[in-house]
From Swiss-Prot:
It comes from Pyrobaculum aerophilum (strain ATCC 51768 / DSM 7523 / JCM 9630 / CIP 104966 / NBRC 100827 / IM2). One of its GO terms (cellular component) is signal recognition particle. One of its GO terms (molecular function) is 7S RNA binding. SUPFAM superfamilies: SRP19. InterPro entries: Signal_recog_particle_SRP19, SRP19-like_sf, SRP19_arc-type. Part of the signal recognition particle protein translocation system, which is composed of SRP and FtsY. Archaeal SRP consists of a 7S RNA molecule of 300 nucleotides and two protein subunits: SRP54 and SRP19. This is Signal recognition particle 19 kDa protein. It is found in: Cytoplasm. The keyword Aminoacyl-tRNA synthetase does not apply. Belongs to the SRP19 family. One of its GO terms (biological process) is SRP-dependent cotranslational protein targeting to membrane. Transmembrane segments: none annotated.
Amino acid sequence: MKKKGGRILWLVYIDASVPRSRGRVLPRGLAVEKPSLKEVVQALEELGYKFQVFPDKKYPPLWFEEKWGYVVVETNEKIREIASKVAGKIREMRR
């Protein structure tokens, strides 16, 4: 069922190891290598977003890969803006 009232942030969107043709939305220089759902949740909490987590879901174009999970972020911002902020926060946390 499609979730309403927010933006869906798949982990694939910010993963530097996934090519753009497979779903990455950020440039490779801004993306992070193999982000975990735990890191994304922590970054969203620190950024002050309200969200819902769906860990057992697979990104449809990569259904044959391992489970990625996604987060529904309750905001009207564009998904690229959210992805950029989350990836930046994850890079900051990994230092």
